[in-house]
């Protein structure tokens, strides 16, 4: 089959690799029909090379049609249309029973001290082959796949793999009061969808912050009040307080996370890590840190006293101290974590209808063949061509 593989920093290629076989009796094989490029894929593309091997298959936002089932699979049959969550969860352990599928005790990567395995996401999370490929082996075939109806385009359902549950959980964790206010930092796919979900769930004011004109324009179209970071810079806090009676918003969603691109200090750290052998680089990334907390520091400034910060952006080890004194003084609540995809499916599926309240049918800015994946990664990295969300079609 053809698959997009990691080869080195800013070097991904579409190669011919062996088709995945059934390995366990509850496995299924899915023929991929659409697969997204996620912002966290850029962390692999640029920063997390020490945790990758050349040839690793990337991608964790796939959907498709069941091609083959193992002998103990009864939950799906050949020909079923399914979306595959990005976290690999068994559905039966204590953590899955608590709705914490991202902490699945069956697939936790204990030797790394991390949570549930993830498709296409490094040795930190199990080194499971990803979904930017023609076929994908999916374990736990009776529990993990999300069955969706045939008929509507893939655009209707593919974001159940990551974007929708991640954005939904971000809003859930933000705990915005009815008619309340929230600032969304970063209007990439997760931030843009979180802004839409917050408005759909009754927020009275959603402030979106970014510095990419296309992202700001798109969020404005869906009802967000947008602030261009290029204009406000260090005065962003004053601008937000001006819109909220001097208090700041009830909540802030940090949809930025690790500064994988753009920060000179972070860039220098990334370069230094890239010069080290993998074992030393891993240790540096896990202890000294390879990113900055600029977005989180901004969130602490923007949120009102007694408010909530919800972190959905991925961080890779902090190089800045946490502003604990300020957070304590302002009585800020902080919630974060990988999305528990399966937990939110019942909330999300009823919204994926023809009236399309969240705008999923037109959410992708680019649809490209899998063979164009390497160029798509670079375009996404440079924020060129208006690229916000790309679906690759194998």
Predicted regions and their residues:
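Glycine-rich cofactor phosphate-binding loops and adjacent beta1-alpha1 units
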Residues: 174, 217, 222-333
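Mid-domain Rossmann-like dinucleotide-binding core that forms the NAD(H)/NADP(H) cofactor-binding site
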Residues: 81-82, 134-135, 145-234, 238, ...
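Residue-level recognition of short, solvent-exposed, well-ordered loop/turn junctions
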Residues: 23-24, 77, 177, 247, ...
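Rossmann-fold dehydrogenase core element
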Residues: 305-312, 322-362
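C-terminal hydrophobic helical "lid"/dimerization subdomain
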Residues: 297, 301, 342-394
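Residues in the short beta-alpha loop(s) of Rossmann-like NAD(P)-binding domains
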Residues: 212, 315, 340
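Cysteine-cluster motifs in flexible loop/terminal segments that predominantly coordinate metals
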Residues: 38, 86-150, 154
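Glycine-rich beta-strand-centered segment in the early N-terminal region that forms part
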Residues: 18-35, 48-97, 101-102, 129, ...
């Amino acid at each position: 089959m053809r698959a997009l593989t990691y080869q080195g920093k800013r070097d991904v290629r579409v190669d011919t690799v062996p088709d995945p076989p059934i390995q366990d009796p509850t496995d299924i094989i899915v023929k991929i029909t659409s697969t997204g490029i996620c912002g966290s894929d850029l962390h692999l593309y640029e920063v997390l090379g020490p945790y990758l091997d050349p040839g690793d298959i990337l991608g964790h936002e796939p959907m498709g049609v069941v091609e083959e089932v193992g002998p103990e699979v009864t939950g799906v049959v050949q020909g079923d249309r399914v979306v595959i969550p990005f976290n690999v969860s068994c559905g039966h352990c204590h953590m899955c029973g608590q709705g914490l599928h991202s902490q699945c005790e069956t697939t936790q990567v204990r030797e790394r001290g991390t949570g549930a395995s993830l498709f296409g996401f490094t040795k930190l999370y199990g080194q499971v082959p990803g979904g930017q490929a023609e076929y994908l082996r999916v374990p736990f075939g009776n529990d993990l796949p999300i069955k969706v109806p045939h008929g509507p385009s893939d655009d209707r359902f593919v974001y159940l793999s990551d974007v929708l549950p991640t954005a939904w959980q971000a809003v859930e964790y933000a705990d915005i009061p009815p008619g309340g206010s929230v600032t969304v930092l970063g209007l990439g796919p997760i931030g843009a969808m979180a802004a839409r979900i917050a408005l759909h769930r009754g927020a009275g004011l959603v402030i979106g912050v970014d510095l990419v004109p296309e992202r700001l324009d798109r969020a404005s179209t869906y009802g967000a009040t947008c602030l261009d970071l290029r204009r406000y810079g260090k005065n962003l806090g004053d601008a937000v307080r001006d819109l909220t009676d001097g208090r700041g918003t009830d909540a802030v969603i940090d949809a930025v996370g690790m500064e994988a691109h753009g920060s000179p200090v972070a860039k220098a750290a990334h370069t230094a890590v890239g010069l080290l052998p993998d074992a030393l680089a891993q240790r540096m990334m896990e202890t000294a840190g390879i990113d900055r907390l600029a977005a989180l520091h901004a969130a602490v400034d923007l949120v009102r006293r007694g408010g909530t910060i919800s972190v959905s952006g991925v961080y890779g080890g902090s190089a800045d101290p946490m502003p604990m004194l300020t957070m304590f003084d302002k009585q800020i609540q902080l919630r974060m974590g990988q999305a528990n995809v399966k937990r939110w499916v019942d909330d999300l599926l009823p919204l994926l209808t023809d009236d399309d309240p969240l705008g999923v049918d037109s959410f992708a800015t680019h649809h490209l063949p899998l063979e164009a994946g390497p160029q798509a990664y670079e375009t996404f990295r440079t924020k060129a061509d208006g690229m916000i969300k790309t679906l690759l079609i194998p």
